[in-house]
Amino acid sequence: MIHPTAIISSKSKISKNVKIGPYCIIDENVSIDENTEIISNVHITGRTKIGKNNKFFPFSSIGNIPQDLKYSGEESKLIIGNNNVFREHTTINPGTSGGGMITKIDDNCLFMIGTHIAHDCNISSNVIMSNNATLAGHVTLKENVI
């Protein structure tokens, strides 16, 4: 189901059973896999690939350009695995040329309200980040980190 107020680029790839709520914006080069739910007022942009069964809560900003002053517009990526939950006001930036061009989140993670994952981070499976926790660029979190 896609809400009529959602703005979705014809160049994005949306799989079956994806729910996109009111006032969401899905830009070109975004790929969203099956059974993901994007509740409302979420912006997903950049070269962002989202796996299956993820849930994005309102006012999340996913894939916008890095907050790295060295970033000069290079085409970097954000890759998100399966079964993750992104609560309200989560922000995630793609990679930069100084860190391999990829920010990656594996599976079964919980990002509580106001979390920020900066450029070139690598988040393994089963990670929990509590309210307003932030990661600077180039941070790696191993499995089961809370």
Explain the meaning of each model-derived region.
Residues 2-146:
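Structural signal for interior beta-strand "rungs" in well-ordered beta-sheet cores
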